[in-house]
């Protein structure tokens, strides 16, 4: 089976991001965005999805967090798309509700690649 990994680098006027993703990892996260809660959530994502995720991001967080959050999201989406390759054997869409800690998360995903 082909390794499902991806490395993404993105540099803009507001942010600089380096991201590595291994979809067949063991749930290891090494996250540094400068935004504590965001780091925590991304680490939990890696842990519970059982993929390895490494992110080093710096941005203009003194102005606002949204540039860093947005650009990390763009990089993570690109990494998943690249790591999945031709998507052979992957179910196109799914949904789930997960109660965790004091929250109920409802997730729906479609990886068809069609624009919204």
What is each stretch, according to the model?
Residues 1-116:
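Structural preference for solvent-exposed beta-strand-turn elements
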